[in-house]
Amino acid sequence: MILDAYLLTRHWRDTPQGLELSLWACSEQGAVNLLIRDQQPVCFVERSLPLALPAGAVRKPLTLSLLHGEAVDGLYFRQQRDLQHLRQSGATLCESDVKPVDRYLMERFIRAPVRIEGDLQRVGNYWRAIQPRLQPVDFQPRLRTLAIDIETRGHSRQLYSIAAAIMPDATTEEDPELRQSDVVFMIGTGEDEQRGHYRLIYQANEKALLNAFFNWTLETDPDALTGWAVVNFDLNFIVQKCQSLGIPCRLGRGGETATVLQPNLPGSPRIARVPGRAVFDGIDLLKAGFWSFDSFSLDNVSHELLGTGKLISSEQDKVAEINRLFKDDKPQLADYNIRDCTLVNEIFQKADLLAFAIQRANLTGLALDRLGGSVAAFDNLYLPRLHRAGYVAPDVNSRSDGLGSPGGYVMDSVPGLYKNVLVLDFKSLYPSIIRTFFIDPMGLAVPGDNPLPGFVDAMFARDKHILPGLIEELWAARDKAKLEKNAPLSQAIKIIMNSFYGVLGTTGCRFYSQQLASSITRRGHEIITRSRDWIEEQGFPVIYGDTDSVFVYIGDDANEQQSADIGNKLMQDLNIWWQEELRQQYDIESHLEVEYETHYSRFFMPTVRGMPTGSKKRYAGLIAPDSRLVVKGLEAARTDWTPLARNFQRELFQRVFHEQPFEEYIRQIAEQLQAGELDEQLIYRKRIRRALDDYQRNVPPHIQAARKLPHSGRTISYLITRNGPEPVDLQHSTPDYQHYLDKQLAPAADGILQFLETSFAAITDAQLQMF
C-alpha cells in the first residue's frame, strides 16, 4: 500500500533489539504511526584516533573524510545511549550530536511530506506501518487543530475548567453538528447544557474532569493543539496536575502519554511532547513570523488583529472575577473560557499561522511545531549534501577560533530635517553575498585552484560548494512564491535564507569560523561603502546607511515623478556598475540586487541626545505618495515608552512634516497632562527578566512597582506617582506630572524641535508657570 502523509511528531527510544523510531503523520485517510525498528545509531571518528568502543559497537572504514582531508571511520551502535556515553567520555567524535530520528529523515531528504510504502494495519482510529519504506513527496496537509485553554484558581494549583474549540475549516462550515462540537469541562454539579456553539459539561472533581477531557480529545482526534502560552501554562499545568493525581496525561494519539520537558538552563523554553499531535503556541508562532505588537497578551493581540478581545481583561480584576464566576456563575466562566479558544483560532486564521508553520517545516525539515532551531535547520539542509560530496562534519563546539566577526555596517548619519530622501535597498544582502562570493564551509576547507578571496585570509572554491546552490534554490522558490502571492511561503523562505549568516556566525554551529562570518559581514561593509561612494559621484549625498540600505538626499525641489525617475535610474545604474565591477575584479557573476525601495517626501534624522553627532537606527519620515508616517527606533516606535510620549511624538511629526502649526498642540498636550486629562496614557509597561529578589542595588522603577503586587507576572504595568512607582492595579497616589513632562514629552519633542530652532521648554515654560 502507498500512502502520502505529513509528519507531525518524531521520537526515538532504545529497545533491547536496538533503536526504534516512532513517527506520527496525518493523511487524507487518517492518522498514521510509523515504527522503524532495529536502527543503528551512527557517528564518525578520525581514522587515526584509537578508541575503546562499548560492547556491540562496530567500527568500519568509510570512503568519507573530514573537510581538511583526514579519513574517517563510521561507528555503529546497538543503542543510542551507548553513543551518548562515548560522547560524554570526551572522545573526539564527528556528528555524534545529530539526533537519530533527524539523521534518518535528512539522509532521505524527507522534510515533512512523506510517501509511505508498506503494510498498513488499522489500530483503533489510526493506521500503523512497521518497517515502511519512506521517501520525500509533494503533499499539502489539511491539519485538524484544537485550541485549548484552562482556568485555575489564580496562582494556586486548583483546576476550574478546560475549554477546547476546533478551528473552523471548510468541513466544519458545511456540517452544522461540527460547528457546535466545542466543549467546556467544568468542575461542579450543574446540568450539562448546549450554550451556542459549545457544550458545557460538569465533572465532580479534577481527576474526572481531566479524564473526560482526554477521552473527548481522543475521540475528536486533532492533528495539532494550539493555545496562548499553551506549553508554558496550560499543558505544563495539566501534566503536573496528572502527576499529582497519579493519572496518565493521555493527550497523545492512541492514548500515549504527553509530557512537558522542563528547561535545563534559565531562559530556555519548555518543550511539549504529545505523540501524534503537533503543539503550536500562538505567541511563539507570531514571533517566529516577525509579527510585532506592543504586547503579546491574548487580549492585546486579538484587539490589534481582530478588533475584539477577551471577556475579562484587567490582570488583577481577572483573578478575582474568575474566582467569583466559579463560585457564583459557572456558565459565565465557561463563556469566558471558550472565548479564549475562539480568539486563538481566529488569530491563527487571520495571521495564516498554520500555513507559515507548514511552509517552514517543508523548507527546513524541522519538526512541524519546532520554533527557533536555525542551526538544526542548517544541518538538515547541509549535512546530507556534504556527505554526498564525500565529507563529514565535526561536532558542535569541537573547533572554534574563538574570534567574532563584525556586525552589519551602520554608516554615520548626517542629522537634519530633509525633503526627498530615497532609500536604495540591497535585496537579501547577506544571502546574495553568499551566492555571489561562494561563501561555504566546504568551499573554505577545500578551495581548489583559482579560489576566490574572502576576508581574514579566507579563500573559497569557485565550483565545489554547497551553500550558494542552496541559496539559489531558495531564492528561485521565493520569487515563485511572490509571483503566486503565497505570503506564508515567501516569508518562511526569507527567514530561512537570512538565518544562514546568523548560523555561520554563532559558536553553536558546527561550521563556525571567523573567516566564514567575516567574509559575509565585511563584504557587506565594502558593498555599502562603495555604493555610497558611487552614488555621491553621481552628485547625490548619502546621509545614512544601515546594513543593507543607503539613504540618498536628492534635493528639496524634486516632485514625486522626478524622485521616482532618479530612484529608478540610480537602482539600474548601480546594479550595472556592480555587475561590471565584479566581473572585472573577480571574474564572477553578481547576484547583488539593488532595489529602489522608498521615497520619503519628508525625513528626519536626529542627533544622539545631547550631542551634535547623528544617531544610528533612529529616524522618521513620510513615505510618498500616500504620506504614511514611518518611525524607526524613536520614542513613538518603542513600547517601553508611555502611550503619552508615543502618541504625542507621532502627532508632532505629522504636523512638522506637513508644515502645520505645532506650538499650540504642544501647549495643549502639556496643559491636558497637568489637568489630569491624559492619565490613561501615563502607563509604562516593562518586562521583568529576573526574579524580583535578584534586584538589590539600583532597583529600577518597574521592579519597585512589581514588588508592591501580591503576585507579579513577566510584565508589569505601572505609573510614576508623587510617591514613586505604583502598579496600575494598586495605584493610590496622584501621577507625578512633572516627571512625564521632563522624561516623556520633552525628550520626544526636542529631537526634532532643535532643527526648528526651538524646544519643548521654550514653548511650554510660560504656560506651565500657571500650574
Regions found by a protein language model. Give the residues of each.
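Active-site-proximal helix-loop-helix substrate-binding element of RNase H-like nuclease domains
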Residues: 182, 192-200, 204, 221, ...
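Proline-aspartate-enriched helix->loop->beta-strand connector
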Residues: 213-237
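Catalytic palm subdomain of template-directed nucleic-acid polymerases
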Residues: 550-570
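C-terminal, non-catalytic extensions of nucleic-acid polymerases
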Residues: 568-571, 575-771
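Short Gly/Ser/Thr- and Asp/Glu-enriched loop/turn motifs at secondary-structure junctions
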Residues: 68-70, 544-549, 587-591
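Common nucleic-acid-contacting/processivity interface regions adjacent to the catalytic cores
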Residues: 319-428, 432-437, 487-526, 530, ...
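Short active-site loop/helix that positions an aromatic residue
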Residues: 234-244, 427-441
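DnaQ-like (DEDDh/DEDDy) 3′-5′ exonuclease domain used for proofreading
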Residues: 1-221, 338-339, 343-362, 366-407, ...
